[in-house]
């Protein structure tokens, strides 16, 4: 059976270059189903505006290289500590370490004073940040730590607290989504270790928690050890490259956080979830991981088997694109968000945006607009029913059509 419209991802690029049709041992209806799915993805991807993903993946050359060498014929696995040589030699630890080194420098970690790995997602990074933080605090105190996080931070933190059986204290947020420091002060137990998750861009409103004020409050009111993890899933991607002082928010030597988690598929543009987790060497040394004899190592990650392909993609991306190209994308996103905010206000749409944010949230439009742009809904107790538009590199061409649709909606209401 011959198919021409759909190719499995791992073979499409190299075979298309050769213009060779593939024989695929599959029932015709199965092939047609796959074809329809592929067509839907490629038609819809550039219309996604309500979720923080960069659809400009730009991985054609990577997959051409990957398929040219038939790497899909072998099984690679990055199990273990990437800083130690693994008995399972089919890994990409050397590339993973170079990715970590690149981002450790980007986030201001002192040379030689960090440890990290390429994660499966931003939540995977948060899971490790909280786990490493818990072990760090247990090495300093016999008392169980309390996990503090804003109510408007990513929902995964609540789930992770449950999985790790941690006492969770949800801190109120102000109208724009930033952690309310007065409430943090009221809920802070001065005598028990504190594990604080700082939101570097809340899920819906794109708010940034005030790290300096959090540290000051800890100095004034807290006597036990503390650990600060930075959830910078989206903002940690673009802030280090953007003009202005936003980079200071994700600089470890300035902000003194203990670990950071960043997503790869959000700003950088990958075709599947991945991310990066980095912590200080002191935190890593306090982990005391379980030793696995047949791996001849102590495995520090919660996950055992890990993707070896994701580190390759990350390595490829940071070598194929210059810092100036990332800077261009970052600045364009922030300028696009400012422009969108201004244009929505000009057509009488109530809209808001936080500093350093590429997220604009606004009064919720009708269902047809929500569905057309894959907008995320929220029922906010202060603003009512709202939606948000996340300006990403691929949404530049969407801004004007979206504003026109919103204008048409407002005009229909008036008439």
Task: Briefly describe each language-model feature range.
Residues 97-104, 108, 131-134, 162, ...:
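Amphipathic, well-packed alpha-helical segments that form the structural scaffold of globular domains
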Residues 117-288:
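Conserved PLP-enzyme active-site core in the AAT-like
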Residues 33-39, 143, 158, 289-304, ...:
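Conserved C-terminal alpha-helix-loop-beta "cap" of PLP-dependent enzymes
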Residues 241-354:
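Active-site C-terminal subdomain of aminotransferase-like
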Residues 24-112, 387:
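N-terminal entrance/gating region of PLP-dependent enzymes' catalytic architecture
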Residues 79-87, 111-117, 143, 168-171, ...:
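Glycine- and acidic
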Residues 1-25:
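Classical Sec-dependent N-terminal signal peptides that target proteins to the secretory pathway
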Residues 193, 225, 257, 271-274, ...:
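Active-site lining segments that contact anionic ligands and/or coordinate catalytic metals
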């Amino acid at each position: 059976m011959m198919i021409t419209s759909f190719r499995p991802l791992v073979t499409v690029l190299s075979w298309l270059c050769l213009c060779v049709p593939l024989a695929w041992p599959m029932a015709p209806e199965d092939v047609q189903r796959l074809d329809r799915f592929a067509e839907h993805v490629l038609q819809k991807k550039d219309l996604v505006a309500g979720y923080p993903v960069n659809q400009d993946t730009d991985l054609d050359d990577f997959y051409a290289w990957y398929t040219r060498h038939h790497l899909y014929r072998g099984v690679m696995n990055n199990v273990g500590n990437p800083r130690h040589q693994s008995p399972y030699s089919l890994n990409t630890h050397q590339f993973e370490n170079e990715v970590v080194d690149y981002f450790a420098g980007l986030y201001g970690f002192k040379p030689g004073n960090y440890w990290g790995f390429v994660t499966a997602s931003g939540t995977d990074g948060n899971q490790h940040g909280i786990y490493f933080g818990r072990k760090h605090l247990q090495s300093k105190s016999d008392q169980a730590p309390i996990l503090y996080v804003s109510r408007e931070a990513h929902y995964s933190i609540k789930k992770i607290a449950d999985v790790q059986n941690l006492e969770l204290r949800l801190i109120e947020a102000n109208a724009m989504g930033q952690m309310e420091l007065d409430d943090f002060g009221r809920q802070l137990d001065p005598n028990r270790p504190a594990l604080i998750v700082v939101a570097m861009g809340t899920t819906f409103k794109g708010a940034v928690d005030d790290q300096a004020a959090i540290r000051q409050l800890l100095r004034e009111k807290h006597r036990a050890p503390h650990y600060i993890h930075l959830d910078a899933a989206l903002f940690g991607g673009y802030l280090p490259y953007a003009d202005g002082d936003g980079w200071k928010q994700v600089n470890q030597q300035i902000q003194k956080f203990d670990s950071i988690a960043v997503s790869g598929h959000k700003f950088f543009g990958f075709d599947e979830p991945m991310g990066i987790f980095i912590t200080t060497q002191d935190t890593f040394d306090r982990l005391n991981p379980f030793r696995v004899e047949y791996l001849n190592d102590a495995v520090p990650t919660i996950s055992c088997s890990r993707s070896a392909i994701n580190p390759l993609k990350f390595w490829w991306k940071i070598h194929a694109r210059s810092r100036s190209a990332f800077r261009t994308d970052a600045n364009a996103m922030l300028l696009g968000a400012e422009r969108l905010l201004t244009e929505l206000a000009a057509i009488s749409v109530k809209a808001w945006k936080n500093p350093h944010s590429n997220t604009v949230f606004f009064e919720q439009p009708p269902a047809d607009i929500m569905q057309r742009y894959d907008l995320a809904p929220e029922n906010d107790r202060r603003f009512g029913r709202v939606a948000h538009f996340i300006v990403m590199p691929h949404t530049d061409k969407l801004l004007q059509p979206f504003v026109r649709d919103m204008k048409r909606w407002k005009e229909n209401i008036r008439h």
